[in-house]
């Protein structure tokens, strides 16, 4: 029986939000770490009879659940986040991202983050925040079947559905299924989005703890209409005649027959980008080691197993399709002329990829009493087949690629938990991406309870530019051929965390050469010079009075040298509000005001045809601070979010009074006015 009100042992008391896994090179599980966080505990052997008694006293915990999860590249067990102050924990777009006016549209990070990935990459990342990924797959362990349903409704029929179910089929075998739908017609013409994502994963471990099996299926189907931004021949945003923003003319998708849709489950995109991907991963491990046991009493023995040598094989199969299409092109529009489209027939560009990868690795655990110290060595063979096509080509152009790489990793978290060392690297020995590499090292130390944790590290990546920069890509429309050298990215990073002060100070210093980028709607370029960029981030939580809190994040960014990168000097996000229970034992609530702001800068423009943000140095974005009010609360397993966003867009004077003073996400791409969102998430246990 589903229980709407139950005590979730771990869910109700966990306060610390689990951090998302750090992106690994290639997002390839074969190259990611898989540590053993503790000695493997076997099933408890108990010879005593445990018969049931229908008349026994109920404790109130019969409907409780203990649930933990881990990621593929780590054995550290984590618990659900029960805090309610951060809406982005349930919303796909992080707070430090901007999206093009409609949830589901292309999005980018305001905080500069280069692509830290060696080897092959297709090159289409504008919709990455909406994808389910391999790295974020959670492998659960639960004492009872657990389900979670979520529904979010926003202005202009914005909707999001979230479904999660996990259960242990056996004590040593768990399976989980997750689905998410994002659908939004948008505020402006030809802006609708429809994204479907699902994930199935399973984790099995033999009773003797020697064999482990990880299985993942992830698929995404993303569809987003593209309008090219609003037209600028008239001041439409300031005109009282266009207070209804859907009446403002746009640059793409305006030909008769290309009508907007508001069908909830429709995926009918006439002019826009359609991306899809499918991943299947099977990882198998077999351990050799030492047995042990703990004798609890005369009748109970807990068997233990300490791995000393591990053999691992990871198989990955993936299919990826990236397509722009326009069923009703209009060659008279300036944007088409700029891109060189002169046809009245349906137009499309497409890259399709199929990947098969096999990885073999060996782990050794030097210290029996410290399973979090290990050395990993391995090699992988990657086979790629691509097909590139457009409406102007004679037909699909096939291409096959292969890569052979070696990789290694060392990790050591000392038993006193004062030191944590991590180092990994991969090197492409042969193939189409030979000489690509990625090297990383990080040291973390607990200085003292007063000072906190200090981390310092270095990373260097030598990578071939993404395949969208290759002349063979179906998205290559430039008349002249061009070759690109390997990019080199060096990164020095560090952080200081002080839990007592609820503060974290971090910094990144980038040194980049041969940076490949887009500098126009359909033009690629490479900066041969060397430039650097410095980032400093301060995160701090202040107590104003009792339960009144102020959470603040401030990011400072500065470039030097010939940098084809524009970033705001300062970005900040602040929350000021109440966090507590208002005297009710089962209530947890947070309400107050949220503010986001960045200093004026020349933000990247967007190419709808390429699905890429590109560098521009002519238009300066000067936005007012984003202001919103929020009321979030949790009652046992029911969670709700009520939000009023973009209050800063209210215009007090003139004939265009109302929420019409829109901010810009990119040149010619305005954000919405007032936006109301209501989301509910409910957990159930069987």
Label the predicted regions:
Residues 1-2, 12:
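Cleavable N-terminal signal peptides
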Residues 3-8, 185-189, 430-432, 560-564:
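A generic structural signal for short coil/turn motifs at secondary-structure boundaries
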Residues 8-14:
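Sec/Tat signal peptide C-region and signal peptidase I cleavage site
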Residues 11, 174, 374:
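Exposed beta-strand and adjacent loop surfaces of beta-rich binding modules
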Residues 15-278, 289-295, 444-452, 667-674, ...:
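Membrane-proximal, glycine/serine-rich, low-complexity loop/turn segments characteristic
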Residues 116, 142-144, 264-334, 338-686:
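Exposed, low-structure sequence patches enriched in small/polar residues
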